């Protein structure tokens, strides 16, 4: 969405990004390993899983412990999502692949080179998940915050803001309503 919003094709008047993957949390060593493994993508092994999915060919989705999840602090919504996946297993993502990691790091590295203060031409709301373990909240704010057209709402949330507790979601929706009505 961020790529589209700053492109010449953009027809949106405003944009809301919710814990966007403008950046990812990865240290220098991890980035080097992914770059090296990314060579496997070039020879046809891009679909090789880097993360073992919680999937069993006979039993389907295997429930992960709530305490280990990096997406939400809301147990009820976490468990509801698992029940939904059990009913509709085809909608689940079965692990991160070499190809996905390679291209995610490549794209987020490109985002670091963009002059966001020039690229953003219309109002944008960044819903920032301060407790995010997947994207780099600080870097997202640093990059997108270059523009005066960006409004940043930081929330004490993990990655899936709209799957968080009612209190966090209410705060997010209030920011969205204010942004869209301004």
Please describe what each predicted stretch is.
Residues 141, 145-160:
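Catalytic histidine neighborhood in serine/cysteine hydrolases
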Residues 4-91:
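Alpha/beta-hydrolase-fold enzymes
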Residues 120, 126-128, 132:
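Short beta-strand/loop motif that positions the catalytic acidic residue
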Residues 95-116:
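Active-site nucleophile elbow and catalytic-triad environment of alpha/beta-hydrolase enzymes
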Residues 16, 125-127, 153:
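Hydrophobic/aromatic beta-strand patches that form the interior of the parallel beta-sheet core
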Residues 133-139:
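Conserved alpha/beta-hydrolase "acid-adjacent" motif
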Residues 175-182:
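C-terminal alpha-helix
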Residues 157-171:
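Catalytic histidine-centered segment of alpha/beta-hydrolase-like enzymes
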């Amino acid at each position: 969405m961020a790529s589209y919003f700053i492109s010449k094709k953009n027809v949106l008047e405003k944009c809301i990004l919710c814990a966007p993957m403008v950046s990812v949390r990865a240290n220098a060593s991890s980035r080097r390993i992914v770059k090296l493994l990314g060579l496997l993508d070039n020879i046809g092994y891009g679909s090789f899983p880097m993360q073992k999915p919680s999937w069993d060919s006979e039993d389907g989705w295997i429930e992960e412990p709530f305490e280990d999840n990096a997406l939400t602090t809301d147990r009820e919504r976490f468990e509801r999502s698992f029940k939904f996946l059990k009913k509709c297993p085809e909608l689940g993502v079965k692990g991160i692949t070499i190809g996905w990691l390679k291209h995610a790091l490549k794209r987020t590295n490109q985002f670091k080179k963009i002059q966001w203060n020039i690229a953003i031409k219309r109002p944008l709301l960044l819903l920032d998940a301060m407790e995010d373990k997947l994207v780099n909240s600080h870097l997202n704010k640093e990059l997108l915050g270059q523009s005066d057209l960006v409004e940043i709402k930081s929330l004490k949330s993990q990655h899936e803001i709209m799957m968080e507790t009612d209190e966090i979601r209410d705060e997010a929706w209030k920011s969205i309503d204010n942004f869209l009505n301004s």
